[in-house]
Structures are given as C-alpha cells and as structure tokens.
Amino acid sequence: MKVFDSSAVLAVIFQEPGADVAAALMSQDNALISSVNLAEVVGRLLDEGLSNAEAAGACEQLPLRVVPLSRAQATAAGQLKPGTRTRGLSLGDRCCLALAQEHPSAVVVTSDRPWTGLAGFDIKLIR
C-alpha cells in the first residue's frame, strides 16, 4: 500500500523531478491519499491559475483512492505534532502520516526530505 503526500502528487501533475517515480508508484494497486492532502493539491492548482473545474478534473484523473479524514486520524495527526515539530511538518503532512499509521505496511510517498528517518514510517522519497 502507498500513501501519497501532496508533494508527490503535484510532482506528477507538473512533471517535476521525481514525477516518473511517483507516477509508477501511483499506478500500483492500493494507492491512497488523505482528503486533506487532496485539498492541498486542489489549492495549489488554483494558485497556479487553473479554474475550479480544471483542478477538479486534474484530480479526477489521478489513480488514487481518496480517504476522508476520520476522527482517529485527526487525533493521530495532532499527536504527531510534538515529534515532527522540529522537521517543519504541516498539518497536511501529519494527516498523511496518520493515514499511513492505519496501514502498518504502508509506504509514504513524498518529495519532502525532512520526512526521511521518521521513526515508525517507511518513507519513499521521489527525488
């Protein structure tokens, strides 16, 4: 199972370095994204000048299963803050990790180097 951070999804959409790695992982079965991270993707697409319809269409094309943020994930994301504060992880980042915690064999796919070495997580950097 792969859990995608918004940075890896945006790399695919914008064909940034690492897009090939992220796209290959995304095309495998059981690729997930938290609804919070999808919201980050949509926001970035709008920042880049896409219309609401274009941003929604781009997200619909992604072979990812969107997982709504649950109460348990929200709590877990909050509990991750003390251990990730020094790495500069955002709320969205912690929601991604909280989703991954629910799937013990999950690989977290990101382009964010500060995630490397986070205890208890299998992190795959795309670049």
Q: Where are the model-predicted features located?
A:
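Short, structured coil segments at secondary-structure junctions
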Residues: 27, 62, 119-121
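Active-site neighborhoods of divalent-metal-dependent phosphate/nucleic-acid chemistry enzymes
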Residues: 65-107
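Histidine- and aromatic-rich ligand-binding microenvironments
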Residues: 2-5, 33-35, 89-91, 112, ...
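Alpha-helix capping/helix-boundary segments
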Residues: 8-9, 37, 73, 95-96, ...
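Acidic, PIN/NYN-like endoribonuclease modules and their adjacent C-terminal/linker elements
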Residues: 1, 97-127
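Short, well-structured N-terminal submotif of metal-dependent ribonuclease cores
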Residues: 1-33, 45-57
